[in-house]
A protein has these predicted regions:
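C-terminal charged interaction modules
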Residues: 70-111
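Contiguous, amphipathic alpha-helical segments that mediate oligomerization or scaffolding
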Residues: 54-59
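Charged, low-complexity interaction regions
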Residues: 48-52
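Short acidic, glycine/tyrosine-flanked loop/strand segments centered on an H-E-D-like triad
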Residues: 40, 68-71
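Short, charged/polar N-terminal "headpieces" of proteins
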Residues: 1-46, 105-111
Length: 111
């Protein structure tokens, strides 16, 4: 006998800034994001005051891509006019409020 359990996340994430807003969709298994999130964390931790804009932008785009997918990550970056700090902030908030607990719970179930 076996058990199949899905831990998929199906979210619509609405982001508002002033009068502008965008809607991003998340349809993914958080456990499949773990490797990408680890890489994003490493890239973000390596950033410092001497990091180039290119390094910062690359880390922000990668983080957003892991969570939202490539096309929507590019939409998010464009929405914030290439402001990496805003992109990182949005991704971090979504991760901490939604994905972090799901990943932790799924990892506990696997043990």
């Amino acid at each position: 006998m076996f058990k199949i359990s899905l831990n998929r996340v199906h979210d619509r994430v609405e982001i508002k800034e002033g009068d502008e807003k965008i809607m991003l969709r998340v349809d993914s298994d958080p456990m499949r994001m773990v490797a990408g999130l680890s890489q994003a964390q490493k890239m973000l931790q390596e950033l410092n005051k001497d990091s180039s804009d290119e390094e910062t932008d690359k880390a922000a785009l990668f983080f957003a891509t892991v969570i939202f997918g490539k096309e929507q990550a590019e939409t998010l970056v464009a929405f914030y006019h290439n402001d990496a700090a805003c992109v990182i902030n949005v991704c971090g908030q979504y991760f901490s409020k939604r994905l972090g607990k799901l990943i932790t719970n799924a990892q506990k179930k696997m043990k």
